[in-house]
């Protein structure tokens, strides 16, 4: 926790992590054991959004709440992380927007239509009852679920006024990202089932793409064989030709687009943004 950005920022109680002691931790553990633990409301602040004049609300938890949230996150990750979809890239260990782009580069080939989705106010709109029922499918410990329920209902303070939270998981909470992924895993499951029912037939290679790939292969082989013997100008010209060949190959679909016997769907999600690639008709994409 101490290594994360904003870890030393205090919540509504004015306490920060640098004042943490063994006595405070022991008292926190005892309050959880006795079921008397009650999270403080988060201190709401607003931060700038990139490429926008709007500001994003951010909840800053109290120090004790940060510790509890981190432990809850670790438990949830141990339960859910092994079963999350490979198409999910947001807020996950060893995954990022870079892994999402890598999946798109590798799997979204020959796509004829794209369906793009952005879930508006995602973190603020999760149904609490729906989320807990999803958790209950895998977790039998009602005391643990009750602890998460308290976190969801803790509310927030803004301009010294208390506000209830009726839905969503507050941005800034350490447990919000994993809860969001658990909630949205239902979308991932839906996309996977849709893919199984939609996909049919076998793809046919695009001959023009194959010719471009072969040309690129020979250019690269020629460059490697002659590189040491070329002068600077020859090397620049060789790299230019190789780059042109790469760009041309990437501009072509690897599969034939007019194969009506073949349909395919691919899906990728990063947090609340998702992308569906469709090889099929416009009607297929519209229905999806």
Where are these regions (language model features)?
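Non-catalytic terminal/accessory segments
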Residues: 1-288
């Amino acid at each position: 926790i101490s290594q994360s950005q904003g870890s030393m920022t205090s919540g509504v109680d004015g306490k920060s992590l640098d004042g943490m002691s063994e006595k405070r931790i022991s008292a926190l553990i005892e309050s959880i054991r006795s079921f008397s633990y009650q999270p403080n409301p988060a201190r709401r602040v607003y931060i700038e959004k990139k490429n926008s004049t709007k500001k994003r609300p951010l909840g800053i938890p109290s120090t004790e709440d940060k510790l509890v949230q981190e432990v809850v996150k670790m438990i949830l990750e141990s339960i859910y992380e092994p079963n999350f979809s490979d198409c999910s890239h947001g807020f996950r260990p060893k995954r990022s927007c870079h892994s999402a782009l890598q999946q798109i580069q590798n799997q979204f080939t020959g796509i004829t239509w794209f369906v793009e989705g952005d879930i508006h106010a995602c973190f603020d709109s999760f149904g609490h009852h729906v989320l807990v029922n999803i958790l209950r499918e895998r977790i039998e410990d009602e005391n643990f679920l009750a602890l998460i329920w308290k976190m969801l209902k803790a509310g927030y303070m803004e301009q010294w006024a208390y506000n209830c939270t009726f839905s969503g998981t507050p941005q800034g909470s350490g447990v919000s990202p994993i809860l969001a992924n658990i909630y949205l895993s239902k979308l991932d499951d839906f996309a996977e089932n849709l893919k199984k029912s939609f996909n049919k037939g076998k793809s046919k290679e695009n001959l023009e793409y194959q010719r471009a790939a072969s040309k690129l292969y020979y250019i690269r082989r020629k460059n490697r064989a002659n590189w040491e013997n070329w002068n600077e100008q020859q090397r620049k010209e060789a790299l230019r030709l190789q780059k042109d060949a790469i760009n041309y190959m990437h501009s072509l679909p690897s599969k034939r687009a007019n194969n009506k016997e073949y349909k395919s769907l691919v899906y990728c999600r990063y947090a609340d943004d998702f992308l569906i690639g469709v090889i099929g008709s416009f009607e297929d994409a519209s229905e999806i």
